[in-house]
Regions:
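Structured alpha/beta or helical-core interaction and ligand-binding surfaces enriched in interleaved
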Residues: 1-118
Length: 118
């Protein structure tokens, strides 16, 4: 599946999505723009050391959880590219999709690892 197919498939399966900014003190202007684009959909911004597919040791990152709606889908789609483009400094990292609290699609961008949870 390509990026757009994954986004569309997840729109049917999921109602939330998240991404990660590992170093909030070193956020790029592109990442700031993306945070602004999704500000109306924000459910939660938390600093933590783990999220689906990743566990940090001795560090934390900001995980942003959003409502996944038709409009959010359209914004993600308009950003174009591929899942591998979701990496600092161009975009936040590790785009994941959930049904309520349950991860459905997980990406570990820096390892080029993407999968649906069974």
């Amino acid at each position: 599946m390509n990026y757009n197919e994954i986004l569309l498939n997840n729109l049917r399966l999921c109602n939330r999505f998240s991404f990660v900014i590992r170093d909030f003190n070193n956020i790029s202007s592109m990442e700031k723009d993306i945070l602004d684009m999704f500000s109306h959909f924000l459910i939660l911004d938390r600093e933590c050391s783990s999220w689906p597919g990743t566990r940090l040791y001795k560090k934390t990152a900001h995980v942003f959880l959003y409502k996944y709606t038709q409009t959010a889908y359209e914004i993600l789609e308009s950003l174009g590219g591929d899942l591998t483009d979701w990496i600092h400094p161009y975009r936040p990292e590790e785009l994941c999709f959930y049904h309520n609290e349950q991860p459905i699609f997980v990406s570990i961008t820096h390892e080029c690892d993407f999968y649906y949870v069974e």
